[in-house]
Amino acid sequence: MSKTAFKGSPVNLAGEFINTGITAPDFTMVKGDLSQFKLSETRGKFVVLNIFPSLDTGVCATSVRKFNRLAAKMNNTMVLAISKDLPFAQGRFCTTEGIENVIPLSDFRNPSDFDVNYGVLIADGPLSGLLARSVVVINPEGKIIYTELVPEITQEPDYEAALAAIK
């Protein structure tokens, strides 16, 4: 069982955080228009999964804004912002913040067990049921080439390390 922390207190995750070198498990999520999005549709591109608890927290919102700015400069790369927020809340945030280079995806239906397969489901503590802050980078062939499980949920991910995996 992987662990992270929330405000200094240990938090358990359901299962093990995903490793590099394996084929990324496919998943289905919900887009803002309530249509489905499948990871398998991204083959041929680099994919950055920016995974976080909720857009209603400052650090999560900051990570989406930063990845949005970075995504504008990346070629052949998609950035997916993944949380359990409802698609309506994600859409409102993206509209208000001018987010145009990141695709917000909701795992609220969880038909493909993304949270368990990637080892990012928070299993206990005050954020139980939400997703742990993490970043996963997938290459155009569908292999995971970079992962970061942020050790403290209240901290931002290492943006530069994620981008370095793509270059």
Show where each model-derived region lies:
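Chalcogenol-based redox active-site neighborhoods
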Residues: M1-K167
